Amino acid sequence: MKHLHRFFSSDASGGIILIIAAVLAMIMANSGATSGWYHDFLETPVQLRVGTLEINKNMLLWINDALMAVFFLLVGLEVKRELMQGSLASLRQAAFPVIAAIGGMIVPALLYLAFNYADPITREGWAIPAATDIAFALGVLALLGSRVPLALKIFLMALAIIDDLGAIIIIALFYTNDLSMASLGVAAVAIAVLAVLNLCGVRRTGVYILVGVVLWTAVLKSGVHATLAGVIVGFFIPLKEKHGRSPAKRLEHVLHPWVAYLILPLFAFANAGVSLQGVTLEGLTSILPLGIIAGLLIGKPLGISLFCWLALRLKLAHLPEGTTYQQIMAVGILCGIGFTMSIFIASLAFGSVDPELINWAKLGILVGSISSAVIGYSWLRVRLRPSV
């Protein structure tokens, strides 16, 4: 029990469990004895009905759309705290992850197009390497434990959130044909209600969560990625302390173990099971997976590092306190973990064209993401000193 308590008390424990869940998913998805059970579990239908409202989704989508909204709620709370009181409190500090995210989307997309521009079909996947899987990136960072400066973790969170928002906008503009304006209208009203609650000083967290459920449902029905609702709710929950209590900090404290030890490992287990059946070296070196690998492994860190360097040289932004440019470069490599967000964009880009292209895209995403995780982790492990 003593060793178990020590493990769960360590900062790296959540990341270790997430990696174990991902490896387990890969093994089960590629084993003849367990692949059927694994896919049956993910395809299990789950129905929610409240009055006339009905949501029918399989287990995989409930995990990705509902449980991950809770994760994004926690991320929103943490980023808000740093924007208001911490390492992103000044305009120049807050601008740094925004500039980094822009570079981290533009350069990978251009690098992908350098490989695929001549092919009008694979060219449609230009946004695949522009995405970052924030959950896996933070999970890998968590493996380094307490040696990671808080400012560096917050920088990665803020960068990945902006990256995700960019990906959501790209999906809405280029890959979605059936946005529901009525649902977007309901979402806008829910956001307005959250703003009024905040301005009126309402401090009951449950009220924000209730409106957040309405917002999540509306965003889900609109065709936009529903996890966005979690970030929005997190930004509106009051942070200011009153009588020594802060609703945002209290909720953050409550959510953290649930997210680290249940939601993220379940997310990893549900999404890491990529089948390697039929994979060949010849296929891996075709323009589609090569463009994705190059975009994630080279384009992401290059774009983030280049735009950060320009921001510092032009004095548009400051480095987060307690971090170095080399650490920022390593975080840029971690942002090459595109994984689930990249797979989602690939399914939108090629789903109606050729399922075989999705398989090759998944292979490129897997190779690029794993390579980025290993290299980014190794670089940070060398650059970060263990805390005493």
Curated annotation (Swiss-Prot):
Transmembrane segments: 12-31, 59-80, 97-116, 123-130, 155-176, 181-200, 205-222, 224-236, 254-272, 287-310, 340-350, 358-380
Cellular component terms per the entry's GO annotation: plasma membrane
InterPro entries cross-referenced by the UniProt entry: Na/H_antiporter_dom_sf, NhaA
Record's keyword annotation contains Ion transport: yes
Top-level taxonomic group: Bacteria
Topological domains, Cytoplasmic: 1-11, 81-96, 131-154, 201-204, 237-253, 311-339, 381-388
Predominant location: membrane
UniProt-listed Gene3D superfamilies: Na+/H+ antiporter like domain
Topological domains, Periplasmic: 32-58, 117-122, 177-180, 223, 273-286, 351-357
UniProt topology in membrane: Multi-pass membrane protein
Catalysed reaction, written as an equation: Na(+)(in) + 2 H(+)(out) = Na(+)(out) + 2 H(+)(in)
GO biological process, one term: regulation of pH
GO molecular function terms noted in the UniProt entry: sodium:proton antiporter activity
Compartments where found: Cell inner membrane
Pfam families according to UniProt: Na_H_antiport_1
Keywords, in A-Z order: Antiport, Cell inner membrane, Cell membrane, Ion transport, Membrane, Sodium, Sodium transport, Transmembrane, Transmembrane helix, Transport
NCBIfam families registered for this protein in UniProt: NhaA, PRK09560.1, PRK09561.1
Family according to the record: Belongs to the NhaA Na(+)/H(+) (TC 2.A.33) antiporter family.
Role according to the record: Na(+)/H(+) antiporter that extrudes sodium in exchange for external protons.
UniProt name for this protein: Na(+)/H(+) antiporter NhaA
Species the sequence originates in: Escherichia coli O6:K15:H31 (strain 536 / UPEC)
